[in-house]
Design a protein with these regions (language model features):
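Extracellular glycan-associated modules
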Residues: 1-267
Length: 267
């Protein structure tokens, strides 16, 4: 009889745990789970997303939830054809979907070759509509002019090649990686901010640079350096190999019994 009682109690404990688990799933879904999602994928250089489309590309499906002061990572690829000098060129934004402000904005400078990396903080400045207007104005206003170099900005971006940009948000800390390597690590006075519960990413648009945007992903956790480099190795589109970053620096040679039967080399 005592054995039956023990078994019954164990079964009841398991049942209670299952009920609590499914209740939590019902209330909160799987937002607690780590997600690393490809939100935009380009299959080749020729059909990568033209960055300066007439309309902004808005992505909401499968974008992981973002919380103020938590952890979040984004990785995107860009191919800059040329540096136009009309104005700043925002090409990536991340927001919580509330509509009040952007959590993260990436833009290229007006006349100076630089990558602007700006965030909203909980008790500091917000990237609201007025601030976004300062960025995209034909006469950019402080703190978004070419002379305004934020602690997270990158002062040089390679042209006419695919470049990977990864930004990792961790509370007050922002890490910026270029082509898989840490380029900037900066600490703000307060944590990054986010509003709403429909996380949204926008890519390109009429104010963006002349070129292409490749594979873009987002994660609700902080990428480690190994993950950043692994994503860089995967490249900007499906079927990618590292040689495609600079295809003219590689030769293809086919040989049979020691004799060359085909070669792309000019030698």
């Amino acid at each position: 009889m005592e054995t039956v009682t023990i078994v019954f109690r164990v079964m009841m404990y398991i049942l209670v745990l299952l009920v609590l688990y499914y209740l939590y799933k019902f209330l909160y879904g799987d937002s607690w789970a780590q997600k690393d999602i490809v939100v935009y994928s380009a299959s080749s250089h020729t059909n990568g997303m033209p960055s300066n489309n007439s309309n902004v590309t808005t992505l909401t499906t499968s974008v992981p939830q973002i919380y103020p002061g938590g952890e979040y990572s984004i990785s995107t690829w860009m191919y800059v054809n040329s540096w136009t000098t009309a104005k700043n060129k925002p090409f990536f934004t991340l927001s919580g979907g509330g509509g009040s402000f952007k959590s993260l904005v990436l833009f290229l400078g007006q006349r100076t070759n630089k990558l602007g990396v700006r965030i909203s903080t909980t008790s500091g400045s917000k990237l609201n509509a007025a601030e976004m207007g300062k960025i995209t104005s034909s006469s950019p206003m402080a703190p978004y002019t070419d002379n305004d170099i934020s602690m997270c900005d990158i002062e040089s971006v390679d042209l006419q090649k695919w470049v990977n940009v990864t930004v990792v948000l961790m509370g007050k800390t922002v890490d910026v990686y270029m082509d898989g390597k840490l380029a900037r690590s900066c600490v703000y006075g307060t944590t990054f901010d986010a509003d709403g519960n429909t996380p949204t990413i926008t890519l390109g648009g009429p104010d963006s640079f002349s070129g292409y945007i490749g594979l873009t992903r987002a994660a609700n956790f902080a990428y480690s350096p190994d993950i950043v480099y692994s994503h860089y190795q995967q490249g900007p589109f499906a079927g990618f190999s590292l040689s495609s970053l600079n295809p003219f620096s590689y030769d293809l040679t086919l040989s049979s019994n020691g004799s060359t039967i085909f070669s792309t080399s000019n030698e």
